[in-house]
Amino acid sequence: MNLIQQLEQEEIARLNKDIPEFAPGDTVVVSVRVVEGTRSRLQAYEGVVIARRNRGLNSNFIVRKISSGEGVERTFQLYSPTVEKIEVKRRGDVRRAKLYYLRGLTGKAARIKEKLPARKG
């Protein structure tokens, strides 16, 4: 492991963030710290994860939601101090790592099947 990777690992350990396991297709609620003037508040952003980029400290993910009939995508840095918490609402069953094709779909066609736990027996 080179020096830069080692420094990134130390920084990730220092941040000590509790990040749940999530993947493309999952519906997540991202709580973002928003500063308006002197006030600070938490803003919830709920949508489907359409991409995840794992690059150590520079990891990020894209969340897509439909707001007022218009598709809105937002990219979040995984270890950003503005991202307070990530909560997985629903697990999606998809066969792709990047779900960019959802940009062209609307309504029922854009639904994602729920991943059910494996049956025992």
Curated annotation (Swiss-Prot):
Extract the InterPro entries matched here. Answer: Ribosomal_bL19, Ribosomal_bL19_CS, Ribosomal_bL19_sf, Translation_prot_SH3-like_sf
- Family classification: Belongs to the bacterial ribosomal protein bL19 family.
Any GO CC annotation of this UniProt entry: cytosolic large ribosomal subunit
Role played:
This protein is located at the 30S-50S ribosomal subunit interface and may play a role in the structure and function of the aminoacyl-tRNA binding site.
| UniProt GO BP | translation
The protein depicted here goes by the name: Large ribosomal subunit protein bL19
Q: What is the lineage of its organism?
A: Bacteria, Pseudomonadati, Pseudomonadota, Betaproteobacteria, Neisseriales
An MF annotation (GO) of this entry: structural constituent of ribosome
Residue spans making up a coiled coil are: none
- Pfam families annotated for this entry? Ribosomal_L19 (PF01245)
Keywords assigned by UniProt, alphabetized: Ribonucleoprotein, Ribosomal protein
Query: Looking at the record's lineage, which domain of life comes first?
Result: Bacteria
